[in-house]
């Protein structure tokens, strides 16, 4: 049995950065790059306990449903995002507000670093499904001796979608330090597109199909390890 070790070389991990935003507004029919994306804040809520008491003791606790929401910040946004922000273009360069807000999916990348490789250690691809943003404030100020660009900010909520074999969710994460390189490439080819294929945000069903080989390999390895251990014990 191994003794616990802390802060070993190569295991001092951290996460940073936000880049490579890919937006799919429902009904737009295409995925577009989100330039100027600066921050995605994930703020899940819910999963709150309701304690029930009986016979003068805590009998059990019920947990409320969890909701995935957050905030998106950027210096600019794709034209396609206007439909998600409640705007419509009625003529080239002319928009009106207070329209129906479309739902959207968003993929983005964050970096995984460690003490040896820095941010070259790995990365994560995050996919948010079925999101909708609320109206947000925009403050335009006069240009002065300390010029600054406006940072747009949108609070978003999500509605979970069905995932076979699991509870509904609106959030997936792929970690390149754990997912095989071939699977990560297949995912990125889907999300970012290739010379032959248009980009798309894969559905949960497509993701489950994509990772099928990983789960099969993991199950086989676990079973093999268990069998070997049992055989050695019996021997």
Description of each model-found segment:
Residues 48-49:
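Positively charged
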Residues 58-136:
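Structured, beta-strand-rich domain cores
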Residues 20-28, 116-119, 163-167:
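Intrinsically disordered, low-complexity coil segments
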